[in-house]
Amino acid sequence: MLRIADKTFESHLFTGTGKFAAPEVMVEAIRASGSQLVTLAMKRVDLRQHNDAILAPLLAAGVSLLPNTSGAKTAEEAVFAARLAREALGTHWLKLEIHPDARWLLPDPIETLKAAELLVCEGFVVLPYCGADPVLCKRLEEAGCAAVMPLGAPIGSNQGLETRAMLEIIIEQATVPVVVDAGIGVPSHAAQALEMGADAVLVNTAIAVADDPVTMARAFRMAVDAGLLARQAGPGARSTQAQATSPLTGFLEALA
């Protein structure tokens, strides 16, 4: 079980809602993934209408919604968007995203920390998307964020855990859940993240753009479960030298 703030999740796989060919495919993929927490870009839905083509099926599916501030370029814009989402959706949960450069979509660390401090004071459960910076993640944790969401690689790049060395430090020092977000391109990337100690992963593009999103969602579900189970089983230590699995000379001595 994974606990973040006031909610508990059985699934360690969070999913997004962007890039799907149709809302029906999105909902079917989310169900196949087993995900219980789904991010929702506020700029893509009509928050005033709960019969919105994206919002309505998500509400019907019974998943927890995590509105995000994607599109915000400053702390002020993010805080404004967060307040709108809370009023419209009735949730104080928020994925904080601030990326001023549309080409790279890298999170702005200064504006993110500034917004996080303000939103925590307003009672939001803040899950900030951030760079894989151990110092920043610790500062966000100290500011009161309920979890941290460092990137594995740039959003939508499918490059995998390019920031692995920094992620390991973040995981080791964190006292809040660590959710690896962005860059996860195939199920094995998700399994690796859970194996190394991440509490969850957030996957969107890899599922949404697959030839068969529903089957890919199911594959990610299995990979996350496998990665978590492997970590709980206690993997053997890595070694720079070969380690024999059976005696090398015993049978020769027996023949002497």
From Swiss-Prot:
UniProtKB keywords: Cytoplasm, Schiff base, Thiamine biosynthesis, Transferase
Pathway(s): Cofactor biosynthesis; thiamine diphosphate biosynthesis
Subcellular location: Cytoplasm
Domain of life, source organism: Bacteria
Residues forming the catalytic site: 95
Keyword Transferase recorded: yes
Enzyme class: transferase
Gene Ontology BP terms: thiamine diphosphate biosynthetic process
Reaction it catalyzes: [ThiS sulfur-carrier protein]-C-terminal-Gly-aminoethanethioate + 2-iminoacetate + 1-deoxy-D-xylulose 5-phosphate = [ThiS sulfur-carrier protein]-C-terminal Gly-Gly + 2-[(2R,5Z)-2-carboxy-4-methylthiazol-5(2H)-ylidene]ethyl phosphate + 2 H2O + H(+)
This protein's record includes keyword Chloroplast: no
The protein's assembly and partners: Homotetramer. Forms heterodimers with either ThiH or ThiS.
Protein's name according to its UniProt entry: Thiazole synthase
Source species of the chain: Klebsiella pneumoniae (strain 342)
Organism ancestry: Bacteria, Pseudomonadati, Pseudomonadota, Gammaproteobacteria, Enterobacterales
Encoding gene, per UniProt annotation: thiG
